[in-house]
Amino acid sequence: MSLIGSEVKPFKADAFKAGKFVTVTDDTLKGKWSVVFFYPADFTFVCPTELEDLAENYAEFQRLGVEI
């Protein structure tokens, strides 16, 4: 489900970025284009396919200034 242009509700989550765990909040992403990706569980059909596509396009997202 795409929510392009939508504001996120306040949240706080741990993420693994650049080889370390970081805390991400709605304030962290404020004013930036962002992709927030959730999946139901490991070893489901969503995990390998969509995450692989996201990883393959990561450099392009970075080039466009998008936070993932």
Swiss-Prot record:
Enzyme class: oxidoreductase
InterPro entries per the UniProt record, alphabetical: AhpC/TSA, Peroxiredoxin, Thioredoxin-like_sf, Thioredoxin_domain
Listed GO CC annotations: cytosol
EC code(s) of this entry: 1.11.1.26
One Pfam family it belongs to: AhpC-TSA
Record field: catalytic activity: a hydroperoxide + NADH + H(+) = an alcohol + NAD(+) + H2O
GO BP term, example: response to oxidative stress
Domain Thioredoxin, first and last residues per copy: 2-68
Active site feature: 47
Gene3D superfamilies associated with the record: Glutaredoxin
Additional remark text: The active site is a conserved redox-active cysteine residue, the peroxidatic cysteine (C(P)), which makes the nucleophilic attack on the peroxide substrate. The peroxide oxidizes the C(P)-SH to cysteine sulfenic acid (C(P)-SOH), which then reacts with another cysteine residue, the resolving cysteine (C(R)), to form a disulfide bridge. The disulfide is subsequently reduced by an appropriate electron donor to complete the catalytic cycle. In this typical 2-Cys peroxiredoxin, C(R) is provided by the other dimeric subunit to form an intersubunit disulfide.
Description of how the protein assembles with itself and partners: Homodimer; disulfide-linked, upon oxidation. 5 homodimers assemble to form a ring-like decamer.
Cellular localisation: Cytoplasm
Gene Ontology molecular functions: NADH-dependent peroxiredoxin activity; thioredoxin peroxidase activity
Coiled-coil blocks: none
Keywords: Antioxidant, Cytoplasm, Disulfide bond, Oxidoreductase, Peroxidase, Redox-active center
Annotated family: Belongs to the peroxiredoxin family. AhpC/Prx1 subfamily.
The protein's role, per its UniProt record: Thiol-specific peroxidase that catalyzes the reduction of hydrogen peroxide and organic hydroperoxides to water and alcohols, respectively. Plays a role in cell protection against oxidative stress by detoxifying peroxides.
Domain of life: Bacteria
Gene (name only): ahpC
Protein name: Alkyl hydroperoxide reductase C
Major localisation: cytoplasm
Cytoplasm among keywords: yes
Taxonomic path: Bacteria, Pseudomonadati, Pseudomonadota, Alphaproteobacteria, Rhodospirillales
